[in-house]
Each structure stands twice: as C-alpha cells, then as structure tokens.
C-alpha cells in the first residue's frame, strides 16, 4: 500500500496494477449486489444476444478504481469523494485488466486530487474510463 501524503503529490504522478477477473469474484459480486440479470449470470443467454459470454458486472470492474485510490494513488491517506465512469467495452471472466491512474489536477484549498483513470484488458483494449476525485488527509 502506498502512503502518498498531500505534499508528495504532483500532476503527472501515475500508478498502475494488474488484476484478473475470476468467476469467484463474479459470483461474490452477484450475491452482494443482488443483480441476477442473465447477461451477467447465463453465458448462453449472453452469447444469444451478441456477446462472447457472460459479461462481467460493470460495477465489479469499476471497483478496481477504488483499489487504485485506496492502495496505489494516493493510497493510505485517501478518501474517494466522487467518480464519473464510462463503460467502453465488455469484460469477461478470465480477462486480465490493467488499471492506470494519473493525477491531472490538485486543489490545495480542498486538498483534493483529480485522477484520470482507465482500465484496459489484454491487447490494450480500453474497457472503462473514469475521472476520480480524491481527498487526501495527511500533509
């Protein structure tokens, strides 16, 4: 876990990590969210409507933005305050995702960092883009 403090941050600072999406994560997220839409739970249905298989829950994929902020950029001293997300392409179980974030703006008055983030999968295909606002609670 990174421990960037406010005074350590600068525009252009980047962090990244990789994660693979597992069936176990899908099952757990489905139980927690209560979302039983067959697009996410029934691969045959998903194929019939034009996908390669069951589509990973968008908010499961988006949860990796929380990991980015809480563990990597800024890490320990961060509190996610807002996020705007665009889903660009579907994610499937077994995909390996690269989550990248870069600080694009710092507000001294609010001690808030704005992070431009994206998630891509193998081959570099972007699956999600986000703008994240993060409070930093340590000087």
Regions found by a protein language model. Give the residues of each.
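Hot-dog-fold acyl-thioester-processing enzymes
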Residues: 1-78
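HotDog/MaoC-like acyl-thioester-processing domains
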Residues: 1-14, 91-139
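Generic structural detector for well-ordered beta-strands
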Residues: 16-20, 86, 133-135
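Sparse recognition of residues in long alpha-helices and their boundaries
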Residues: 28, 45, 81, 110-111, ...
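Short, intrinsically disordered/low-complexity patches at protein termini
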Residues: 39-41, 51, 64, 79-80, ...
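Mid-chain, well-packed structural core segment of small domains
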Residues: 69-99
């Amino acid at each position: 876990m990174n421990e960037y403090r406010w005074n350590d941050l600068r525009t252009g600072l980047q962090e990244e990590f990789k994660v693979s999406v597992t069936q176990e994560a899908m099952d757990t997220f489905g139980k927690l969210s209560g979302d039983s839409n067959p697009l996410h739970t029934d691969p045959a249905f998903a194929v019939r409507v034009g996908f390669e298989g069951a589509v990973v829950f968008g908010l499961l994929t988006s949860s990796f933005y929380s990991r980015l902020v809480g563990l990597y950029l800024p890490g320990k001293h961060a509190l996610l305050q807002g996020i705007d997300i665009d889903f660009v392409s579907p994610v499937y179980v077994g995909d390996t995702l690269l989550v990248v974030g870069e600080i694009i703006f710092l507000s001294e008055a609010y001690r808030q960092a704005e992070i431009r983030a994206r998630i891509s999968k193998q081959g570099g295909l972007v699956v999600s883009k986000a703008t994240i606002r993060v409070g930093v609670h340590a000087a």
